[in-house]
Amino acid sequence: MVLSSEASSAADHSAAAPIPTSSWPQLLGRLTEGKHLEPGQAGWAMEQIMSGNARPAQVAAFAVAMKMKVPTAGEVGELADVMLAYARPMPADLIRDDTVDIVGTGGDGVNTVNLSTMASIVVAAAGVPVVKHGNRAASSLAGGADTLEALGVRIDLGPDQVARSLNEIGIGFCFAPQFHPSYRQASVVRREIGVPTVFNLLGPLTNPARPRAGLIGCAFADLAEIMAGVFATRGSSVLVVHGDDGLDELTTTTTSTIWRVQAGTVDKLTFDPGDFGFARAELSQLLGGDPQANAAEARAVLGGAAGPVRDAVVLNAAGAIVAHAGLSSRAEWLPAWQDGLQRAAVAIDSGAAEQLLARWVRFSQHV
């Protein structure tokens, strides 16, 4: 299964320094020259954006220039830390310390069905607590929030309600605009410029529930290791994944590259789902539609329908269960995958996933 392996340490990424005095001309000048920012400068820029002191042109220039330069893990970590500091806080006493998130950067341009959304429900039904962070579609026809809404889940719950959902149902959804109101200006700019930027990396890194484990999809192969580096500095157990067909998911059309984050280190692996008996799918078999179409697909898969979409959902759900198992230093790679795949399949075939969705819908509508 593992064709190649490379390791790096979170210690390679220096901690962010106090935010220095800076200016947009100084900062943008460095970026357009291809130079890394000084420690604290990325944090300064994000502080300007989140506080509403940055103009739209400055936000757009920064977002694009940072991605073109290729950010460091330290720079992205500063952006995420400032964004989290502005987020609506979750009730810490009600949030378990072993939650998992399943989310991607978006931006792969493929418009697949909402695999991570379906996988989240399966993982929760398998007994792993899930706090999913997500938003409406930015470039595809339906984002995770759009599909959940079409399924009947109320997506605009606040911190206390999400915490209750997690504790009573086993899953909660943090709708990004509800928890990151100060990010509104950057969201508008991101939609207007219409191309992936450094901001695509921030969604998976800024879940306000701060889950310690996750299956994190990255559509950008050159940036996935940077995301993994940020998670490593946090001591997370995460699989950052990039389908070698370009998907920000574990794919079944070919191999995937995985950056496994555990105990502060990052290992790069090549993962072949065929090693676990998965048939190769065609990308066209994983394509989605509008929210109603994706919701119908989700109901079918959670109801037990076989086929390429189910395979991809089971694979991604298993990946999240593997990441969750990584919170224990005793977790072993192959046994964890075997366990995760079995638990994901049973969660669907037993009806547990379908039943959990029904309970979640009822809870969210009456909380």
Swiss-Prot record:
Mg(2+) 2 binds at residues 248-249. GO terms for biological process: L-tryptophan biosynthetic process. Its EC number is 2.4.2.18. The keyword Ribosomal protein does not apply. It holds the Pfam family Glycos_trans_3N. Anthranilate 1 binds at residues 104, 135. Its cofactor is Mg(2+). Keywords: Amino-acid biosynthesis, Aromatic amino acid biosynthesis, Glycosyltransferase, Magnesium, Metal-binding, Transferase, Tryptophan biosynthesis. Residues 1-17 have a biased composition (Low complexity). Anthranilate 2 binds at residue 190. GO terms for cellular component: cytosol. Binds 2 magnesium ions per monomer. Pathway: Amino-acid biosynthesis; L-tryptophan biosynthesis; L-tryptophan from chorismate: step 2/5. The keyword Magnesium applies. It comes from the Bacteria. Residues 1-22 are annotated as: Disordered. Gene3D superfamilies: Nucleoside phosphorylase/phosphoribosyltransferase catalytic domain, Transferase, Pyrimidine Nucleoside Phosphorylase, Chain C. One of its GO terms (molecular function) is magnesium ion binding. It catalyses: N-(5-phospho-beta-D-ribosyl)anthranilate + diphosphate = 5-phospho-alpha-D-ribose 1-diphosphate + anthranilate. Homodimer. Catalyzes the transfer of the phosphoribosyl group of 5-phosphorylribose-1-pyrophosphate (PRPP) to anthranilate to yield N-(5'-phosphoribosyl)-anthranilate (PRA). This is Anthranilate phosphoribosyltransferase. The gene is trpD.
